[in-house]
Amino acid sequence: MDHDKLEANLLDHALTKYLKSTKQLDEATVPKHVNNVRGFILRIIYRHGSCTIKDILKEVTLSPSATTTALNHLEQEGFIERSRNNNDRRTVWITLSESGRGAAEQMIENRQQLIDGMFERLTAEEKKTFLAIIAKLAQ
């Protein structure tokens, strides 16, 4: 196995382990009908406070129709609320309801617990280096 494949496999393994762990935590602490996609959308809305579907589409890899379907489910389940912009009726603002905010906060807390657990094994210098690398990759 060449060097690049080893690195790719290592990164893939780490990401898979992280995603599996977050899924298990979410399944134990978040309402069952909030799947990964809907949870991701809830966390996007949480970060924005209030946003439009265009704002969400900038951050997801879903089609506009799949995003709208997920938002429809979240609205039916009482996790989000939609309201029209009084100045431009074409613009629909999306905000979290109380239950949506609670679910998003729980998912964020779940991820923070996992990251805290992972970072316990690292020195301060290793954490700093790791975060610098992640920031560079995310650019």
Swiss-Prot record:
GO BP terms: regulation of DNA-templated transcription; response to stress
UniProt keyword Lipid biosynthesis, yes or no: no
Keywords associated with the record: DNA-binding, Transcription, Transcription regulation
DNA-binding region: 53-76
InterPro entries: HTH_MarR-typ, MarR/SlyA-like, WH-like_DNA-bd_sf, WH_DNA-bd_sf
Keyword Transcription regulation: yes
Entry's Gene Ontology molecular function annotations: DNA binding; DNA-binding transcription factor activity
Any Pfam family: MarR
The protein, known as: Uncharacterized HTH-type transcriptional regulator YwhA
Organism field: Bacillus subtilis (strain 168)
Classification lineage: Bacteria, Bacillati, Bacillota, Bacilli, Bacillales
